[in-house]
């Protein structure tokens, strides 16, 4: 087999899987947050140094490589970005909000950080 074709096919599979998994996790997590009246849109973007971001207009951007991480790490990133829909910065108020949504977020962030090099480079 052509190695480039295999790589392209694998990346396409990961993107499709990411779209499915992130939509399912977002649909489960978002309704728990009283400041959200609807599910926010999200798109996928490969990023070298970020797992996600939130635009000022409220669009979530998620790294498709995140789908390779454990579910608790995916939930952490999604919750992190959903909290930005209420607090657009990393202020103490933001972290209080994140603590209220996911009290053990720091443990999941540490796990994700420990896996980042492997997940982002495969």
Over which residues does each language-model region extend?
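Active-site-proximal or metal-binding-adjacent scaffold patches in catalytic folds
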Residues: 1-76, 85-122
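Walker B catalytic acidic pair
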Residues: 81
């Amino acid at each position: 087999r052509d190695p480039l074709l295999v790589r392209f096919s694998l990346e396409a599979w990961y993107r499709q899987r990411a779209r499915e998994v992130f939509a399912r996790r977002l649909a489960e997590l978002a309704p728990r947050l009283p400041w959200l009246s609807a599910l926010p849109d999200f798109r996928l973007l490969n990023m070298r140094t970020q797992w996600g971001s939130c635009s000022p207009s409220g669009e979530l951007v998620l790294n498709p490589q995140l789908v390779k991480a454990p579910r608790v790490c995916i939930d952490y990133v999604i919750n992190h970005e959903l909290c930005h829909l209420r607090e657009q910065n990393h202020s103490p108020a933001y972290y209080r909000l994140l603590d209220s949504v996911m009290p053990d977020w720091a443990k999941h962030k540490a796990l994700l950080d420990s896996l980042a090099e492997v997940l982002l480079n495969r």
